[in-house]
């Protein structure tokens, strides 16, 4: 929801805007929601039509990216996933050569192995930043990290740190141009149905069941700490917040649509997309294709 660490301070959320009017009685502030994700299903469409439509959309996206990049180097955090692989593939397809891919972690990790294989196949320059326990200790206790944590949380989100040291090293070692634009593959997997593997019980075309959606959100997204000893106290509070975020159940055709809508608003917008603060902190532009 709109809450922050400060009870009297609220945040503007994804799909919302604020209208501020200066009146004789002071400022009149109104918040409006203009968009909420809810997937629906076409009445009739063939697989061939879907593929053609998808290709048209993707071509439009990456032609726009090339215009925005305007000759600058595009830096792609290339993992083993399909999202980032699609980015480098489309840039290759459209003939944009100023591309650098990078990966990070322990040497030989599976993500970086696939990353290098893809970059080599496409003839793209590839950079690797090694991680280790000792290096993480140094990074985490640095003054730069303290500044980043303060910069990136917005009093509402966890600072994303996974690739923060990698971008730091790429910058400090002059391995990428100072005017580079970072293009990650964030969030493309969600509308493609990635959650169907994690919570298949919701992907069965059943009509909306709010209790089932609420319990699945709690199970999937609130599992990193043990709050079972306070379940009777906390669960009603969490469920109330979840239902406030989802709004009217009738807008969703099924459980999966409601589950993904909450994920888009609360996980993607406030955590995954908040990882873009990494690039901003180190002085780089970014662009999201998906």
Identify the role of each PLM range:
Residues 19, 261-276:
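Core structural elements
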Residues 22-24, 36-255, 275-290:
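ATP-dependent adenylate-handling active sites, centered on carboxylate activation for C-N bond formation
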Residues 258:
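Shared catalytic-loop signature of beta/alpha-barrel
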Residues 1-45:
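N-terminal segments that mediate ammonia production and transfer
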